Amino acid sequence: MSILDIHDVSVWYERDNVILEQVDLHLEKGAVYGLLGVNGAGKTTLINTLTGVNRNFSGRFTLCGIEAEAGMPQKTSDQLKTHRYFAADYPLLFTEITAKDYVSFVHSLYQKDFSEQQFASLAEAFHFSKYINRRISELSLGNRQKVVLMTGLLLRAPLFILDEPLVGLDVESIEVFYQKMREYCEAGGTILFSSHLLDVVQRFCDYAAILHNKQIQKVIPIGEETDLRREFFEVIGHE
């Protein structure tokens, strides 16, 4: 079952500077997709379009049956927001509230109940328990990233989008995140994250979508025998 369908999407910042051109991509429910591309390929631009940050686009995409296109009504935009959650590489958070209050606040925006018990359990897994009542302004970059990731894992939006999600995380936290990410997908969620780390995508993703020359050139199912490095450099033409 498809959770996200991107059809013929072109994106620009100025009309004479097209970043993406006629992009097509389909994400299935319950899978992890890695979005790969060299620096400047347009990974963040595509994510910003899917999350509503950038509205200079043509074509359309459909998320959970809700069709999005340029100039869509505010009601449609609001509906889309409740079906996705976005974690940026350098999160912008309300710094003068506590981590727990932030997670609770985001739940209220999504009109979902906040479970202190589930939050406490997840915080323990991330070795974050002693920070839950600290102001976000007092947290390191890595711990701020944990707040964003825990929020997404608890919300269970149908689509969880991440842009370089490992920034600031230690090795143990990365392993915890990927374990929880798998549980998220087993429960029916879909994850799309951009990365320039081939080894990370190879290990943790079900599919890799390679963005090059303004388009998704190839979507590769990842298995034990997949040589993602070879596949990637065959597409971009050099190593």
Swiss-Prot record:
Coiled coil: none annotated. Involved in the production of the bacteriocin subtilosin. Required for immunity to subtilosin. Gene3D superfamilies: P-loop containing nucleotide triphosphate hydrolases. Changing F57Y: In strain: ATCC 6633. This is Putative ABC transporter ATP-binding protein AlbC. Residues 4-238 form the ABC transporter domain. It comes from the Bacteria. ATP binds at G37, V38, N39, G40, A41, G42, K43, T44. It comes from Bacillus subtilis (strain 168). It holds the Pfam family ABC_tran. SUPFAM superfamilies: P-loop containing nucleoside triphosphate hydrolases.
